[in-house]
Amino acid sequence: MSKRAYNFCAGPAALPEAVLQRAQGELLDWHGKGLSVMEMSHRSDEFVSIATKAEQDLRDLLGIPSHYKVLFLQGGASQQFAQIPLNLLPEDGTADYIDTGIWGQKAIEEASRYGHVNVAGTAKPYDYFAIPGQNEWKLSKDAAYVHYVANETIGGLEFDWVPEVGDVPLVCDMSSDILSRPIDVSKYGMIYAGAQKNIGPSGILVNIIREDLLGRARSLCPTMLNYKVAADNGSMYNTPPAFAWYLSGLVFEWLKEQGGVAAMGKLNEEKKRTLYDFIDASGLYSNPINLTDRSWMNVPFRLADDRLDKPFLAGADERGLLNLKGHRSVGGMRASIYNAVDINAIKALIAYMAEFEKEHG
């Protein structure tokens, strides 16, 4: 087999090679059963055991309290933008949202279709290069919930603190930084995360929701989007994306083998520090984000001359450094350095960036 490339894609993102190798080995014959996970009935004892273990491993990794349900859902985080207000926002209620970038804005736009949304805080005055402090927010007195995006994958802003909202349920999109380091789940009413960045392949979403928030769905909420229906049916009201669920479970096992999220947090801190330090010391590359708000997982950077973008990307591709092109809405470059992207990938990227700067700087 040819050497695997270093994949800096924002999502679907790199998966641990050990996970891919195990899935390859089990593809035709899972545990001697003579069939693939893709061919199993989701009601079978075999698949139920896969699903049960995946949930327990995730609970172990994040220290999820027993009064939280763990749901494996379909539709990705974008579907949650509608599903959240349908389940948690009364028709005459208000939801507070924090705008720190494109994904926060999409959540606000969708929620506004179902009720009153108060944009309690926004990074717009800072041109989305910094997160407004909570002292700048204007939270509602009676909000049904407060929603924010922990890490904006496109802009490269990330909260390094948890908002204090009292008894109001805190709802967080952690699609791109879940499992990157320890968190206190008990501070949240609900956490949701699309899988295709730090969990597994696309097609499945993890939802961690406090039990008292179940059963609040509006009458018009489709059955398939009702959190309580999903919880009551073990996330199997209909046929789930079984193979994506299985692969996510393998990633959870791999994370435990690496020492869990505490160990992963130390590795991720080293990775992001190494890359940002190089960028900051460079004369060709720059990152505009406020130092304390820089993302651990998604590192956007620009070259001093946009005309160098194409040759930079071409040279990166030749060296097996893939998917470094920034999001179409902002341009530039972006290195997504999720859990499966190890320090060797960072070192290889920096070596190339230094070489390119020597030639073009």
From Swiss-Prot:
Any one Gene Ontology cellular component term annotated for this protein: cytoplasm
InterPro entries: Aminotrans_V_dom, Pser_aminoTfrase, PyrdxlP-dep_Trfase, PyrdxlP-dep_Trfase_major, PyrdxlP-dep_Trfase_small
EC category: transferase
Modified residues (N6-(pyridoxal phosphate)lysine): K197
Keywords: Amino-acid biosynthesis, Aminotransferase, Cytoplasm, Pyridoxal phosphate, Pyridoxine biosynthesis, Serine biosynthesis, Transferase
Alphabetical list of Pfam families matching this protein: Aminotran_5
GO biological process, one term: L-serine biosynthetic process
Function as written in the Swiss-Prot or TrEMBL entry: Catalyzes the reversible conversion of 3-phosphohydroxypyruvate to phosphoserine and of 3-hydroxy-2-oxo-4-phosphonooxybutanoate to phosphohydroxythreonine.
Assembly and binders: Homodimer.
NCBIfam families: PRK05355.1, serC_1
Name by which UniProt lists this protein: Phosphoserine aminotransferase
